[in-house]
């Protein structure tokens, strides 16, 4: 039996992820008028652009919801965000500037917690506002069915009847007004925004054109650091981790991770830290473009990775980055709770994060411009006395290094012979324009 319902299941309970915006408001009212029994579920994700969460379920009841619930997802979302930092679960970067997968993290939490709440109410059909071209339709599909094996999916935006009647925002606004709700469309922005406590995503409309830069975006978690008229004074901040977990900012310890993330957002946001412009590959392998904000995630990530590089050895760090990139892809694809992702998460949290205890002090300036001012940890394997250029007792001698050079580089002869072979077969040229060793000339001299 198919899990996707193409038309409205009349007379049945349908859970809708209700944001209170025009789209979900019109969808809820339309479903009720057509004979379905809608239940509204609103996720409190700590969205920085949402002022009154309690009002959203009340509006849902006015529009015809059989019941409306507000589900506080902030604690779980911050926990997953910290886990992503511990694992470096980020795969989209441009010139070293990172997208912190804040929307995929939000979908992982929303998709599981809302469907779990629906299941408690005996609601086994789920609808949301994701479209067929995006990533979210697949993320919600996976997380929903992971949480409730009996779940069926109904999306108004895949229903031709709904699209024919209410296919655009103008039609939806008129529909709400005719029903007596006087819903007015908000002023159209040049892009769309989706946000949660971890970050904000700005995309679509004008941002689909690559000649529209970050300068058209009005940040909701930070400042327009690119505007010279915006004053952004430099600021020092100290971040403390204990066993991989952020616990303090500027000497203030937080027992509540949500409050710590909010403060990290405030600190990083004052500088526009963590804002990035990315061209990425969607799940369906088509490229999209987004401008992202994540001031708190960026702040914690910088401090965490500084401690990682000072505490762990080279091979461990290399594996951390490789696993993190793969895990970031799983997260992006809606597979954050799949076994292959859990395996990588466990490895990083068990063997890497557990050793990360210490403090990092940063000086934040404008945007992603910062300096590391100090790094302190009892677990540091950085020992300056081992490599000091000053005279004194040393842990190894010149003779030790001579032996190391000999043993570590026994393959030089083998490498030289391979280069000679490459020249003979025409793979390498002895042209003066190449940066490769002039092995052809060297071979001639050797033979003479």
From Swiss-Prot:
Task: Please state the protein's primary subcellular location.
Answer: cytoplasm
User: InterPro entries of this UniProt entry?
Assistant: Arg_succ_synth_type2_subfam (IPR023437), Arginosuc_syn_C (IPR048268), Arginosuc_syn_N (IPR048267), Arginosuc_synth (IPR001518), Arginosuc_synth_CS (IPR018223), Arginosuc_synth_type_1_subfam (IPR023434), AS_cat/multimer_dom_body (IPR024074), AS_multimer_C_tail (IPR024073)
GO MF annotation list: argininosuccinate synthase activity; ATP binding; protein homodimerization activity
User: What keywords appear on the UniProt entry?
Assistant: Amino-acid biosynthesis, Arginine biosynthesis, ATP-binding, Cytoplasm, Ligase, Nucleotide-binding
Q: Which reaction does it catalyse?
A: L-citrulline + L-aspartate + ATP = 2-(N(omega)-L-arginino)succinate + AMP + diphosphate + H(+)
- Binding positions (ATP): 17-25, 43, 129, 131, 136, 194
Residues that bind L-citrulline: 99, 135, 139, 192, 201, 203, 280
Q: Please provide the Gene Ontology terms (biological process) for this protein.
A: argininosuccinate metabolic process; L-arginine biosynthetic process; urea cycle
Tell me one Pfam family matched here: Arginosuc_synth
Gene3D superfamilies in alphabetical order: 1.10.287.400, Argininosuccinate synthetase, chain A, domain 2, HUPs
Q: Where does this protein act, in terms of pathway?
A: Amino-acid biosynthesis; L-arginine biosynthesis; L-arginine from L-ornithine and carbamoyl phosphate: step 2/3
Enzyme Commission number(s) from the entry: 6.3.4.5
Q: How does it assemble?
A: Homotetramer.
Q: Which HAMAP family does the UniProt record give? A: Arg_succ_synth_type2
Quote the protein name from its UniProt record. Answer: Argininosuccinate synthase
**Which gene does this sequence derive from?**
argG
């Amino acid at each position: 039996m198919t899990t996707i319902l193409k038309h409205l299941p009349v007379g049945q309970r349908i859970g809708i992820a209700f944001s209170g915006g025009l789209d979900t408001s019109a969808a809820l009212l339309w479903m009720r008028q057509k004979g379905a029994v809608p239940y509204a579920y609103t996720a409190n994700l700590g969205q920085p652009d949402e002022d009154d969460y309690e009002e959203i379920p009340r509006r849902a009841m006015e529009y015809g919801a059989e019941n409306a619930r507000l589900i506080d997802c902030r604690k779980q979302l911050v926990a997953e965000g910290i886990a992503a930092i511990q694992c470096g679960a980020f795969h989209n970067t441009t010139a070293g500037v990172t997208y912190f997968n804040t929307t995929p993290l939000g979908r992982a939490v929303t998709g599981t917690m809302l469907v779990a709440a629906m299941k408690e109410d005996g609601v086994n059909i789920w609808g949301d506002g994701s479209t067929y071209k995006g990533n979210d339709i697949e993320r919600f599909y996976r997380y929903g069915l992971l949480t409730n094996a009996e779940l069926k999916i109904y999306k108004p935006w895949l229903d031709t009847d709904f699209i024919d009647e209410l296919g655009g925002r103008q039609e939806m606004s008129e529909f709400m007004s005719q029903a007596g709700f006087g819903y007015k469309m908000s002023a159209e922005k040049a892009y769309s925004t989706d946000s949660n406590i971890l970050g904000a995503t700005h995309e679509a409309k004008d941002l689909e054109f690559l000649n529209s830069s970050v300068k058209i975006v009005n940040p909701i978690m930070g400042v327009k650091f690119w505007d010279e008229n915006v004053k952004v004074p430099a600021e020092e901040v100290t971040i403390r981790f204990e066993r991989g977990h952020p616990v303090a900012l500027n000497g203030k310890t937080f027992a509540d991770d949500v409050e710590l993330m909010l403060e990290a957002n405030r600190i990083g946001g004052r500088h526009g830290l963590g804002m990035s412009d990315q061209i990425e590959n969607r799940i369906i392998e088509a490229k999209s473009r987004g401008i992202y904000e994540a001031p708190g995630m960026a702040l914690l990530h910088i401090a965490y990775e500084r401690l990682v590089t000072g505490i762990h050895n080279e091979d461990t760090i290399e594996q951390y980055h490789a696993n993190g990139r793969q895990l970031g892809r799983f997260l992006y694809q809606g597979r954050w709770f799949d076994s292959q992702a859990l395996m990588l998460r466990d490895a990083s949290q068990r063997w890497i994060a557990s050793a990360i205890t210490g403090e990092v002090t940063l000086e934040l300036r404008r945007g992603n411009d910062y300096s590391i001012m100090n790094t302190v940890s009892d677990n540091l394997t950085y020992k300056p006395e081992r490599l000091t250029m000053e005279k004194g007792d040393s842990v190894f001698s010149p003779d030790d290094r001579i032996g190391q050079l000999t043993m570590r580089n026994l393959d030089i002869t083998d490498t030289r012979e391979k280069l000679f072979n490459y020249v003979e077969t025409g793979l390498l040229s002895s042209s003066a324009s190449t940066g490769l060793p002039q092995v052809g000339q060297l071979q001639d001299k050797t033979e003479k």
